């Protein structure tokens, strides 16, 4: 074994040891990491606060980058399940991959947050003791938002130190790796490379995170909605070739859309 290889292995061991120490430190401070129940009935104040105050900010400032299957770190913030699932270091597109990767389609390839943890996804919300201090200190989103407040977007005509290219190197720290991430990239708080949140937006999100990041359960489908769904599913699932072609054409034009049944209520419910 040559000296260069020994040096590389020592450095790798050092970083691995640092991450392990950080994890142990969080465990000592706030207890072990466990998947938490974060949804509440839509009638509760917590769920109402998420729907009325938090979700519009997330949709306006975060979802623009974190909505697709190939979002940075596979973090999809467009749904309750995506937020709770968290992020992954695995690349969606990897040109050097020689074998097929296990797909990570939300709602398809795992049903619970724990199953996503087993598949390699790490939390972006605090999963240790649910205290206000722990929710901010051991929650990745909270830390990244605070980082942006400490290091606002530089006042530059052309930003320096930000790589927006499609093939840029992916950086997806866990909460245990966050301190090193901030030291290495102080200006990489969230929203990445974008203007800071307004004071109101920032305090709204931090209040939500501090109180456990409670989100809403899904509203049950009504009998009228289910009847409409059944009608369209019957239409789109005829087995003859002509209807198969028609259904495929319709699907290819609608699968990215949010659909609603306009005749059922004045205020549409999107699916």
Model features per residue range: what roles?
Residues 5-13:
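Sec-dependent N-terminal signal peptides
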Residues 15-17:
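C-terminal motif of bacterial Sec signal peptides marking the signal peptidase cleavage site
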Residues 19-271:
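Aromatic- and Gly/Pro-enriched helix-to-coil junctions and flexible linker segments
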Residues 1-3:
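N-terminal secretory signal peptides that target proteins for export/translocation
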């Amino acid at each position: 074994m040559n000296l260069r290889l020994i040096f590389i292995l020592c450095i790798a061991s050092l970083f691995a040891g640092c991450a392990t120490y950080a994890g142990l430190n969080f465990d000592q401070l706030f207890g072990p990491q466990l998947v938490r129940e974060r949804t509440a009935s839509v009638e509760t104040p917590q769920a109402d606060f998420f729907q009325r105050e938090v979700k519009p900010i997330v949709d306006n400032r975060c979802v623009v980058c974190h909505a697709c299957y190939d979002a940075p770190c596979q973090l999809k913030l467009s749904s309750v399940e995506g937020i709770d699932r968290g992020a992954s270091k695995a690349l969606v597109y990897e040109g050097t991959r020689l074998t097929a990767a296990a797909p990570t389609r939300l709602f398809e390839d795992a049903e619970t947050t724990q199953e996503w943890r087993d598949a390699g996804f790490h939390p972006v919300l605090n999963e240790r003791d649910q205290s206000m201090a722990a929710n901010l200190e051991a929650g990745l989103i909270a830390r990244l938002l605070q980082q942006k407040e400490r290091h606002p977007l530089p006042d530059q005509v052309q930003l320096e130190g930000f790589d927006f290219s499609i093939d840029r190197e992916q950086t997806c720290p866990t909460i245990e790796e966050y301190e090193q991430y901030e030291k290495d990239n102080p200006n990489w708080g969230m929203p990445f490379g974008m203007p800071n949140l307004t004071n109101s937006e920032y305090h709204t999100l931090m209040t939500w995170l501090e109180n456990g990041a409670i989100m809403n359960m899904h509203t049950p489908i009504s009998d009228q909605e289910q009847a409409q769904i059944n009608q369209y599913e019957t239409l789109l699932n005829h087995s003859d070739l002509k209807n198969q072609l028609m259904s495929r054409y319709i699907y290819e034009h609608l699968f990215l859309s949010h659909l609603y049944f306009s005749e059922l209520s004045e205020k549409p419910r999107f699916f």
